[in-house]
């Protein structure tokens, strides 16, 4: 029998208790956090789908606490080279994750180390190589602030994707050939070929349409011929499924909540080519942050979210028990996905993946975006430098550029 001292026994016991009490990866640790770009299998409406993902110690994505640095070892277990962009964060340029600017993609089996100071907020990470993000190579990147830690509220994440069982190259060929809209021809936005996020949407509007085509409940009667043209250009592709936390509404992610509690819902639109309306239904919500930064709260129960955008909604739940869906409605279509907030023992009603009516176009008159005010605005000062940025693109070839270059 091996002898053990009292001090050794206490030290071992303390270590075991600490390991059980601190399961979060956001605790300080002497070694970098492992993050693996690899394949995984999802059950999408009863059909197995092999997709890609970014897996940390606790599953898809990473979460950090105040003061923690982004000390991560990224390993590529995929069958081809890839590279990951830390969307919204500002790392040193060598760690930013755009291919060959200046670092090349990681080869299969290669590991690369990252270390930079994090900004708090709701962010995400994704491949910066065409076709890879369409394979769902993306995940949440959540950085909590000191206020988040102190707040008396629960946090939850809603991560949105559009998905096709077809290979991404085949999807792109169909879009480029004008055959991407097979079921709902009122389809606008463009797939993120090279992840060009500078354009908020792919809608083609002439100046006369601005201010005419409003959101639901807005005054003004637009020219119907222009409305018809706009409606035909809302979506470039009809996907096989729309996912929230890797699930459809046939088997939604049900998140346990407390009666009368407050929830901060961090929502990421990681879709390749879909704008969503976030609909909280019977629950009134407050939009408190956009793209990782706090804004003066906006109240409502429907908010638009374009590709690559993030928003944080704060929701106060009723004192009684119940279940409340939070839906993501496809712009210009009937398709929808979402999650369910539910108290213990509450009945969760089945939700149809198709709504009764198509959702409208998002924010053509900037009714939402024009009301956003930063909670901590920049200090007013005179302009010191100006840069001209030219946005370009076309359907044939299917290419979107900034200053003549794709990204």
Predicted segments, located by residue:
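N-terminal, post-signal-peptide metal-ligating segments of extracellular/periplasmic oxidoreductases
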Residues: 2-113, 143-145, 149-156, 169, ...
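Non-cytosolic beta-sheet module surface loops
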Residues: 74-76, 118, 131, 268-271, ...
